[in-house]
Each structure stands twice: as C-alpha cells, then as structure tokens.
C-alpha cells in the first residue's frame, strides 16, 4: 500500500471570531490582505539574508542552524502578529525557493525571486488548524495570530472560516480529513500544510493538501481499454471486461479554435488596413502578432493533449487494464468527416498516450480502425446503416441500440414496463455510436477479426500484404508469419468525386 497527495480548494465565504459562527469579523478581507503582506515581507527578508549569507566567504559565515534561527527571530521581531509556526513556514519556504534558484542567481541567469505583496499565500502547519462541521456549515478553525498580538487586540488567536463545500466528492474528502480516527484506516486522510490565498479576482480560498492510502493496482494484459477518436465526442473509451466507459467532450477545443480563428482574421484585417507607420517596419514586425497567436495555439494543443493522455491512462489504471488499444492514425483523416481529427495534432496525442502508458507498464497497441464504427459490438454485424446518425448506433441485425432492456439484469424483452426476469425497470436502449466504436476497439485482435469477416463477405478492406510470403494481415509494420519488414502498404481510400 502506498500514499498519494492531492488537494481541495475551498472558497472562503466569511470569517468569524467563534466556532458557532455568530460573531462576524467585518474586516476579514482586509485582515487577510494584511497577513498576506506580512508573509511576503518576511519571505523577501529571508531571501535577502540567504543571498547575503552565501555571498560571504566561508570562513566568515556562521553555522546554517544559527542563520535559520536568526531569520526566524527577525521574522517574529518584524511582524509579532505572526504565530511562531507560521514564521517557521515562511523561513522553510524561503529556504526551498533559494535552493531551487541559487545557481541560476549567481550565474546571472535569473533575478532574485520575490514574494508578491498582494497575492503571497499564508502558510500554516497542519497542527495549527482543524476542520469542523457544525450542522450544515463547513468551518476551518485556524490559529491566525500570535498570543502576544491577541492579548493586545482582545480578539483571540483563532479565526473560523466558513467555506463553500458544494459537491459530494469534496464533502466526502472534508469528512474523511475531519474524522482522523476513521474506523477503516485504509480510508483515513491526513491533512497537510494549509494555504490561504487570494486569486486575481480578489476572492479568498483555502487550499488543503491531503495524503491518502492507495492500493497498488495489478494490471492484467487481458483487460483491454479501447480508445476511439470520435466525432460526437472528442475521445471515448470503453473496456472489454466491463460496461464502464468514459469520454471527453471537445467543446473547449472548438471554442478555443473559433476564438483563435476570429482573432487571426481581426489581426490580418488590421495589417491590411494599417497606416504607413506600421508597414514601414518590415514584414517580420507586421506578422509578429500572428506568430504570437500561433504559438499560443500550439501551447494550448500541447496542454490539452497532455491532459487527455493523463485521463486516458488514469482510467486504464483504475480498471486494471494492462493493454490500451488505439486507432492507427495513418490515413485516418481521409476516412472520417471529423473536423476534430483533421485539425488536431492527434499523432502528438497518440505519442503522449504511449509515453505515459509506458511509465506504468501498460502496452499500447495501434489497430486498423476500418469498420470499427459500423460494426456491432454485440453480434459483429457490419453495415454502414447501423450508424443511423453521427451520435446514435442501432444494429440492423440484432437490434442493439433499439432494444427494450432491464436496467438491473440487462435482460432483453420485446415489450412491457417491468422486467420478466427480476421485476426491475426496463427502458429502451440508447447506444452512443462512439461508445460502440470504443467497445469494438477494446476487443483483442479486432482488426484481424474484422478483416477476416470482410474477406468472407466480400466487403472491401485495406489490408497489408507481405511481399516475402504473401501473408495478409490487418495492420503492423512487420509480417506476423515470417517477420519480414518488406510489406506492401495499402493505398489510402479517397471519396469518389
């Protein structure tokens, strides 16, 4: 059993002086901004001390322990409002920042890092705050001020943040962190260093990292995950061993693409109608905004592909799949009407999936995608009209996608509102076309199965032929029989004019 670390981000709704949340602190935003500024000033002072210390000759330096103690006491002296453990976190974080950047600073490759006065986070050790649930209110009890300061202010050392916990997943995490003495130790979560931080819109958040036990998933090579690059959905996946599925909507991609296209047209029109002052600086300067836009689009695509690849591999690990089957991308844009596939760097996505899967010991197999969207994953019947629309699949032979089926036991019946087998609720089956394709792709050796079926029925199929022994196979760069690499690649099928 291992451990993993994640974090939850909770918006602060209000701050109170008591755990019952009856005495409201009206100036809490101003108080947090002041504390954030104190943390930034103390952190910058520590960084300057570290720079001065390591700039001195070694024989003139005090011990590093004495240096860190001096930094701590200077922080407390500069801002007595800060609790000792908060001051300690400031010193430790400054040390980490210095260690990461010291070499680059002395080489004059970067300037001295600084904490921003307006957005520096307030860091608190995990033993000076706790989570409280009072009826339906979620509260974080924080020791925000030192004892010396609280005596002068008369408001106490602790503040109570009322936070927004809106979804069931976050509520479950909050409850598990709060109940440290969980009955099942395998489900207990341990809180980490709390950060209180303001975003660029001026809203305050509590970021709570937590550690939780993870069980090592045993990957089974016979469990296969099929990944379909679809039209209705950008990416859809299914498994050969279960009915579970997942998908990624390509809406954000289309939105970004339209925004970039509109911006590019706008810039081109500006260049076209610009005055002589701009044109006189040469072509390179005139086209610089378009180049910047192209770089932005490239970075967005790279980020999205990383995110998609991570989600796909994580889904495979969660289901214990030792194999991921994806479509062989050669010629795929010529055989589909998907704008996503034609305009997106899907080869880069495939490469990222392969690399991330390799890190976890998962094998990635590229299969020939022919007829995977037209084949019924239940009975194997291949027919173009099976896909009644871009998003709906209905098999013309077995009725998959148009049957009446029980939700509980999946019994198929002709009519009725109640299952004849278990008495459960029945409803008409709706099958997503991309899910059916992903289910086909998750079948081991699916391209070979489809090729043999096509040859049997006389359906045209783009197969690969070995020049040495004449063996015909669905995909691959080497012959499955003789191992020769001298194979005849099929020509791309193009739509008739």
Curated annotation (Swiss-Prot):
Q: Where is this region: Wedge domain (WED)?
A: 123-214
- GO MF term (any one): DNA binding
Record's cofactor remark: Mg(2+) is required for dsDNA cleavage.
Which parts of this chain are annotated as the region Target nucleic acid-binding (TNB)?
Answer: 375-432
Keywords attached to this entry: DNA-binding, Endonuclease, Hydrolase, Metal-binding, Nuclease, RNA-binding, Zinc
Q: Which cofactor does it need?
A: Mg(2+); Zn(2+)
Q: Does the keyword Isomerase apply?
A: no
User: What is the protein's applied use?
Assistant: The small size of this enzyme and its ability to function in E.coli suggests it may be useful for genome editing.
Show the active-site residues: 228, 327, 434
Q: Where is this region: RuvC-II?
A: 433-453
Q: Does the keyword Mitochondrion apply?
A: no
Record-listed E.C. numbers: 3.1.-.-
Q: Extract the ranges annotated as region (RuvC-I).
A: 224-374
Stretch forming the signal peptide: none
Give the similarity note. Answer: Belongs to the CRISPR-associated endonuclease Cas12f family.
The UniProt record's further free-text remark is: Belongs to a group of putative class 2 CRISPR-Cas systems, type V-U3, which lack the proteins involved in adaptation.
Q: What is known of its domains?
A: Has an asymmetric bilobed structure, with a recognition (REC) lobe and nuclease (NUC) lobe; the sgRNA:target DNA is bound between the 2 lobes. The REC lobe (residues 1-312) is formed by the WED, ZF and REC domains, while the NUC lobe (residues 321-529) is formed by the RuvC and TNB domains. Has a split RuvC-like domain with the nuclease active sites.
Reported function: CRISPR (clustered regularly interspaced short palindromic repeat), is an adaptive immune system that provides protection against mobile genetic elements (viruses, transposable elements and conjugative plasmids). CRISPR clusters contain sequences complementary to antecedent mobile elements and target invading nucleic acids. CRISPR clusters are transcribed and processed into CRISPR RNA (crRNA), which requires a trans-encoded small RNA (tracrRNA), but not this protein.
Oligomeric form and interacting partners: An asymmetric homodimer. Guide RNA is probably required for dimerization.
Please give the name of this protein: CRISPR-associated endodeoxyribonuclease Cas12f1
In which organism is this protein found? Answer: Syntrophomonas palmitatica (strain DSM 18709 / JCM 14374 / NBRC 102128 / MPA)
